Amino acid sequence: SLLFAGRFVDWLDTKKGFLWAIGIWSVGACLHAFCGIATSGIITGNWFVGFHGSKEIISTINDTALVINVSVALFIFARFVLAVGEAGNFPAAIKTTAEYFPKKDRAFSTSIFNAGATVGALAAPITIPFIAKSFGWEMSFIIIGALGFVWMGFWVFMYDKPERHPRVSAEELAYIQQDDIADSKLEGYVPETTSKVSFVDCFKYKQTWAFAFGKFMTDGVW
């Protein structure tokens, strides 16, 4: 999914690509909260109930297997929507880093935003149980999803390309673009040409399988 999400971000441009990614992710997060209501609506036809009402309706249904199957299917769908948005987040972040940092600073800047996921993983066991206990488990999904929409607002008004950003000075722009300036001044500079590798050819390398195995073993927990 990262492969196609990266191409999608390139096609849309960084700002729009990240907006789509965080928007879809936020919708997916909020959808989890409504799985109970959707389950009661699909099985009983009663859609106009709140979170508490859906719990009561589901608890009175005798066919437990049907309830479980529908609920699990809805959660899988919500997780799929969440994953589509999540897949676009990392390519957009890398693209933003490439736009705002010269090559020598990109590794450090990438480590900063990548550490955000670790901070979130540490904060989740503290905050999510408190929200779920105080307001119900549904609100833990809605609040987290709503924070994504809040971040979208900051992104719309605060981000722009360095050459168009009003708060980027000429000195800062020159620092950001130092690699382009240095390359253009090289005598006999020849742009690097690379050949494209097809998606299928990637599976011919043992490094691909090693990476895939590592992701398979860790991403389920992560």
Model-identified regions with their sequence ranges:
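Cytoplasmic helix-loop-helix junction between adjacent transmembrane helices
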Residues: 78-117
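Helix-loop-helix hairpin linking two adjacent transmembrane segments in secondary transporters
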Residues: 118-166
